[in-house]
């Protein structure tokens, strides 16, 4: 079973995210549980929590179909201790919000060394940041997203993801989310079925599909291997349709939320319908 949707707005209340996802006939969705560009947010009230849970139940979104994303401000590998502590506090709050909402996944960008510490030291800080937060929460898996490798962001190599996982004590509560645009921009080719086979064989060898907890389905305005993060609508960018057809027809991607972060929300419903059709076509073949 494939779960496909988009990163929808929670403006006006978290429950609205589920409603908006249902309107585009999604079977998965992503959201921010707070303003992603602010450090602090008001605590969740019982009313907000209950309304969100009721909307998810009404529209048949189980916890495994929802991939919340944390704040863009958080850097779990920050080289400066004071800033690292601030990020760790905010990340814990994000996990606790998921816990309160009955959600089981939290997607996040791993972190950046800011040219001040080496990659290994930064990856170790990220793993320790995850350990600190997991020790104070229950039931929520920390889902590390691969990055395009812009600036000093880590996570653009599968080896980075594997190193972070290796440093996490509770392996049952850590996973990864693969963003197709980020992977392509980082030098993992997805432009044909053959290239997809190679890239995901490498992913299996280095990280392992057992850790795959979500996908971001995005085409790329950015060039292959450019280390530039620029999303595009499916089939309109430099990746093309084949990668998304491959993913929809491969059972290794079953049972996880796969969400669009493509550039035109007006065609999300069409993109979701197209993705679903690829799966149906394969099953009928």
Swiss-Prot record:
UniProt source species: Enterobacter sp. (strain 638)
Annotated EC: 3.1.21.2
GO biological process, one term: base-excision repair
Function statement: Endonuclease IV plays a role in DNA repair. It cleaves phosphodiester bonds at apurinic or apyrimidinic (AP) sites, generating a 3'-hydroxyl group and a 5'-terminal sugar phosphate.
Name of the protein in its database record: Probable endonuclease 4
Residues reported in the UniProt entry to bind Zn(2+) 3: 182, 229, 231
Organism lineage string: Bacteria, Pseudomonadati, Pseudomonadota, Gammaproteobacteria, Enterobacterales
Residues reported to bind Zn(2+) 1: 69, 109, 145
One Pfam family of this chain: AP_endonuc_2
Catalyzed reaction equations: Endonucleolytic cleavage to 5'-phosphooligonucleotide end-products
PANTHER family, per the entry: APURINIC-APYRIMIDINIC ENDONUCLEASE, ENDONUCLEASE IV ENDODEOXYRIBONUCLEASE IV
Family, per entry: Belongs to the AP endonuclease 2 family.
Cofactor: Zn(2+)
């Amino acid at each position: 079973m494939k779960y496909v949707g988009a990163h929808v707005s929670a403006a006006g209340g978290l429950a609205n995210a589920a409603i908006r996802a249902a309107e585009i006939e999604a079977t998965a969705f992503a959201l921010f549980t707070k303003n992603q560009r602010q450090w602090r947010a008001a605590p969740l009230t019982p009313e907000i929590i209950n309304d969100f849970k009721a909307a998810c139940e009404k529209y048949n979104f189980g916890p495994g179909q929802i991939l919340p994303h944390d704040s863009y401000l958080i850097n779990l590998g920050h080289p400066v201790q004071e800033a690292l502590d601030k990020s760790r506090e905010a990340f814990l709050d994000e996990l606790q919000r998921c816990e309160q909402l009955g959600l089981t996944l939290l997607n996040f960008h791993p972190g950046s060394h800011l040219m001040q510490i080496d990659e290994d030291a930064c990856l170790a800080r990220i793993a320790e940041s995850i350990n600190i937060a997991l020790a104070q929460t229950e039931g929520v898996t920390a889902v590390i997203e691969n990055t395009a490798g812009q600036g000093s962001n880590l996570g653009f190599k599968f080896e980075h993801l594997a190193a972070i996982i290796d440093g996490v004590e509770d392996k049952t509560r850590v996973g990864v989310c693969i963003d197709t645009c980020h992977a392509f921009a980082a030098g993992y080719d997805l432009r044909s079925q053959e290239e997809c086979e190679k890239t995901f064989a490498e992913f299996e060898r280095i990280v392992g599909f057992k850790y795959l907890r979500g996908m971001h389905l995005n085409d790329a305005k950015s060039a292959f291997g450019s280390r530039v993060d620029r999303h595009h609508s499916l089939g309109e960018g430099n990746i093309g349709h084949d990668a998304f057809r491959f993913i929809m027809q491969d059972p290794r991607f079953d049972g996880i939320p796969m969400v669009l972060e493509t550039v035109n929300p007006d065609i999300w419903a069409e993109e979701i319908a197209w993705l679903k059709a690829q799966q149906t076509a394969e099953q009928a073949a």
